[in-house]
Amino acid sequence: MTWELEIKELELRRQKALKLGGDERVERQHRLGRLTIRERIEAVLDRDSFTEVGQLAGDAEWENGKFKDVAPAPYVMGLGKIDGRWVAVGGEDFTVRGGSSAGLARRKGGQGGFVEDMAKELLIPMVNLIEGSGANVASALKAKYKRLPARDGFERCMELLGLVPVAAAVLGPTGGGPAGRAVMSHFSVMVRGAAQLFAAGPPVVERALFKKVTKEELGGAHIAVDKAGSIDNGAASEAEAFEQIRRFLSYMPSNVWELPPLVESEDSQDRCEEDLASIVPRNRLKPYDMRRIISLVFDRESFFEIQPTYGRASITGLARLKGFPVGVVANNPLINAGAPDARDSNKMGHFCELCDLFHIPLVFLVDVPGFMIGPEAEAMGTLRAGMRAMHIGMKAKVPRFTVIIRKCYGMAGALTFVNNRLCYRMAWPSAEFGSIPIEGGVAAAFKREIESTGAPDRRLSEIEEEIRSYSSPFRTAEAFAVEDIIDPRETRPRLCRFIEAAQGYLRTTIGPVPLGGVRP
């Protein structure tokens, strides 16, 4: 006897699973301009690398003890490769109950499912392709009881954040648990216009708050990405979102016990760009393009910006020097003169923590007059957020290298280096430093003296000029209070040499990052 009948049933069940929620719902998904979950997995992974797990799970119909039909579970997951490296991948099937969770004995994925277990045990990155509404209130009719939300299994999501890279793409309307899972990632991206993110959707908002809003008004990318910063990046299409995930992972090790991957670079480490000698205006009040400096210093076309539309007075992203991954943190003088507010501080702190976890050295490009000031900045908690970012930076164990391009003042300037470990600081001739800018600082420190004269404006100018005469960066270098003054054109060669030299130390940092106490 053979098992031919059972093998035929297996093939039948597989074919039904491949049809997802049926032709009509698949066509509707396509009409909305969105891919199905199986198409998404195929698009984000290397060709023919996907091995599905749990394909037969679903809500089956039986008649007289014989299998009749099955509605697939609204989640597809398995093992695949991105750029030849293994990843765990999974996502909601919106064509089956809108991607809401299924009442299975064991979760396939989502919060605390098999796919998360696979990422943890195999120590491989986790890729979440998210489009779903989370819990389905109708499930109580079948179960005959209401369960506690603590069973949603976010514990595994939390564990993964300390072990392997986690990337998430929000690809359609997403609420509840899937929305929380999108945020519990190291990198997230959402499709503008097609995807929305919220804790609860419009029907719940209307019932609870008596407000009518559309999904886009509630949680479109203009909210989730640009204003709230809940999601890191926006994308114009699903294809672009997948490309961003692939690119993000290209800088990451597979887990915290590995170093980031080195790629072969044809960009000479000795490349010196003439434009760097003139890019900073002699007028210290005029802004310039920091992103242009980034493009000239780091390996060509290697900069991958993270959160470009949130916290716009700062710039964060991944790049390479001589093929080695580095994290770039820069001030943006085109926005608020580069002064970080609470949003910028949260952005920089999160990014530094990411780099520290995955053993990626940090390069700071500094032009900061201090933290953003004024009533609005104080009301949004800029000081506390700034100190939180400083706390993260001070406990980071990765090497850091600081290039002071122009201003470096106050606590925001101090955020860019540490005194308890090696921190190589090099300044351009355009650099200026201090605990507080001369403008405003003199008026505060010499208030009585200035007001007691018959010509306060003239005395203010005299004191400012006297202090400014001591502000040459060469005086600071004479005291070895800054390690080097360099020709701006030497920035890339210097950084390349130090990043390469740091690789031996990086090998001593592998493993999870210990907790550093309670953040401010």
Give a label for each model feature:
Residues 1-520:
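Ligand-binding clefts of soluble mixed alpha/beta catalytic domains
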